[in-house]
Amino acid sequence: MNFKYSYNTIVYTGEDYSIQASRVANYGYDAIELVGEPDLYNFKEVNKINADNGIVVSSICSIFTAKRDLVHPDKSERQNAIDYCKQIADMLAEVGGYTMIVAPSPVGKMYPLAPAEEEQKWAIENIQKVGEYAADVGVNISIEPWNRYETYFINRLDQAVDILDQLNLSNAGIHGDTFHMAIDEKNIADAYKKTGSKLNHTHMADSNRAAPGQGHTDFIPILQTLKDINFSGYVTMELIPAASDPFACI
């Protein structure tokens, strides 16, 4: 099987989109992953530029900052996060994309503000709402665990699967990012294998968040496992300079 490849443009923020798209296309990628800040884009221009370059939008990397918290104890804060996710679903539909990434808790939130049972309940309730809205506009969602140094909430694929299994959605799956997984999974390939057909999106980066081959992650068994489970989503490069805040470049 042949993989479909995409590139996350978060490091290109501030650069003219035509340059971003041309670069991604010239390097042979099939698709591009946009940054989850709708104000950065003119959707009609994005569609034209992508068509001119022969690429599509694979996905949107949603930006879960402190005010976008699906498990916050304040209902108004949770609603703000839901509204943001709906904006991203609309954006994805406008640009003809496939998958939006959903993380229940924002980057940098390192301790709970409510009992674990409550937070789990809010995560399930609110991801369900986001997923239903996404289905209505014709796009998919992918639940992403982050490593323990970026969030306390869910750090491994099996924890994301626990949430997914309690949802009533046909357009939802799991997102596996090899950078995060290298920190919190015992074995990346095994985690992908156990997730199986529930895996619908990936981010690829080496152990230092640089390009594969620049760190110490062994990608051969990882890619073989993706083939073995017939992964049909996009293999998306997310290469970010080392920083305590992964959104610092936006």
Describe each PLM feature range.
Residues 1-25, 40, 96, 154-176, ...:
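Histidine-acidic metal/acid-base catalytic patches
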Residues 1-94, 169, 197, 248:
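N-terminal pre-domain/capping segments
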Residues 11, 38, 61-66, 98, ...:
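Short, flexible active-site-adjacent loop segments at beta-strand->alpha-helix junctions, enriched
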Residues 30-31, 56, 98, 140, ...:
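Residue-level detector of anion-binding/catalytic polar loops
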Residues 33, 59-61, 101, 142, ...:
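Conserved beta-strand positions in the central sheet of alpha/beta enzyme cores
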Residues 41-54, 82-96, 124-132, 187-194, ...:
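Short amphipathic alpha-helices and their capping/turn segments at secondary-structure boundaries
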Residues 52, 71, 75-173:
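Active-site acidic/histidine proton-transfer and metal-coordination neighborhood
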Residues 66-72, 108-114, 149-150, 183-184, ...:
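A short acidic, helix-capping loop that chelates divalent metal ions and anchors anionic groups
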